[in-house]
Amino acid sequence: MLLLCNYYITYRCNAYCEFCHFGDHTNFKDTPFAKLDEFKSNVGQLAKLGVKFIDLTGGEPLLHKDIHLMAEFAHNLKMQTSITTNTLLYPKFAEKLAGKINLLHFSLDSPDEEEHNRIRKVDCFKSIFKSIEIAKSLGEFPDILFTVTNETYKKLPRMNELAAKHDLVLLVNPVFSYFSNPGLSQEAVDYVDEYCDGKMDVYLNKAFMKLRRDGGNDIHNPSCKAVSRVIVISPKNEIILPCYHFANDKIKIDRPISEIRKSEKLRYFIKNEGKFDFCQGCTVNCYFEPSFAFPTNLYAISSLTSKFKYSYNKLVKQKIKKKFTPKTESR
């Protein structure tokens, strides 16, 4: 059952984050942007196939000149939309995106300006707080997304204070091991898990931490549903298999997606999802979030309290605030 589309609308980025392979611009500076007509065709088909969530991702998604049109199109199809941005371009698109993004995430890697800018290798710390001001003036409640690393995990209390100061949810994103990037140490896992426990204004999927303690995905008893519940589409109009981070094959979208989903190649990848050698020990968050969507195993059950808490913040608390908070003109 397809739930989520990770749609890479660009591989290009305007930052150089040390924990992200998109930070190496030499590999991506000449890559194409997703075409709007192809996007609309694909997303329209996905809506009919039952996809409920779409992450407009990159790279830096706001580098795409049609990002607002893409968000509007998906939103009008009743999809839940999400964007994660470093905010450098958010002021340019803020008004056009307002009301069209269900989950708007502003990336902040440290409460200290110097450290954040060093990690990103670009001066963008002040842009985040300017963007928070603009977003809230438009009735938006972005989350502050903190990608926790072995170097920054002890900054978590200060990040919580900073998010609370702006009346926003802190979304804790534990770094995962991929493209030679190390994952969290056991000490960091324990610290983060203990700190976040019971805090209503902090979201951490507890299943992510259990998965790390258990050594990641086990290919002999896989937890991953990266093919059956997620579809990954590239800017080149290809379906990436089994996932972006361990791309092993690609299928050009040159026929209806429903036909592709029934193809022998897709059935092969669904049958073997989480079972490939490279799947051993995997902890890539963006595939395990939908993998734990239904309470069918201990990981999914572990994630329930976290998801209920986040849903309360986004669907109840913030909606009430939006209703009673007048919009003001952004500067």
Regions picked out by a protein language model, each given a short descriptive name:
Residues 1, 23, 238-331:
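Flexible mid-to-C-terminal extensions adjoining Fe-S/redox cofactors in radical SAM and related proteins
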Residues 33, 64, 149-150, 276:
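Short, solvent-exposed loop/helix junctions and linker helices
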Residues 12, 16, 223, 278-281:
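The −1 position to Zn-ligating cysteines in a subset of zinc-ribbon hairpins
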Residues 63, 113, 291:
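Short glycine-rich, flexible loops that bind phosphorylated cofactors or substrates
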Residues 1-96, 100-103, 295, 304, ...:
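Conserved alpha-helical substructure of the radical SAM core
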Residues 25, 59, 109, 175, ...:
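Flexible loop residues that form catalytic
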Residues 1-2, 216, 225, 271:
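Residue-level marker of regulatory loop/turn positions in helix-turn-helix DNA-binding domains and
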Residues 29, 77-80, 100-103, 107-255, ...:
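Radical SAM enzyme [4Fe-4S]-AdoMet core and its adjacent flexible, acidic
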